[in-house]
Amino acid sequence: MENLGWVGRVLDEAPNFYVDLSARLAELGRQPYTTREFFIKYQNRIVFGTDMGMELGVYRNYYRFLETYDEYFNYDTSEVPGQGRWFIYGIKLPAQVLKKVYRENMRRLLPRP
C-alpha cells in the first residue's frame, strides 16, 4: 500500500476493493501528509489489520501512528527492523475516520448473522 497513487487509482476503479494496513506502517509513516489525505479520502475503504502478532508494542505503534502527530519515532521495536532503519511520523486522523478504520468498515464487510 505504500504507492498511494496506484492504490488510489485501484480504489477509484474497483468500488468493492478494500485495503488494510498490514506490514505498511514503515512506508506510510515516511509520507505523513499524503497518507493522511489518502486515509481521509478513502476512509470507507480502509480496515485496520496487522500480521505482526499479538505483541502490545506493535499495536501501540499503530495507534501512535494513526492517532497522533508524533514526529520521528521508531516504528519497529525489534532488534533488526523488518523494513529499514528509519523513523516515521504520525498522521492524527479525525475521530470519525479512526472509527471507520478500526471498526465500522469491517463490520460492513462482515455483518453479523
Give residue spans per PLM region.
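H/E-rich (His + Asp/Glu) clusters that bind or coordinate divalent metals
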Residues: 1-113
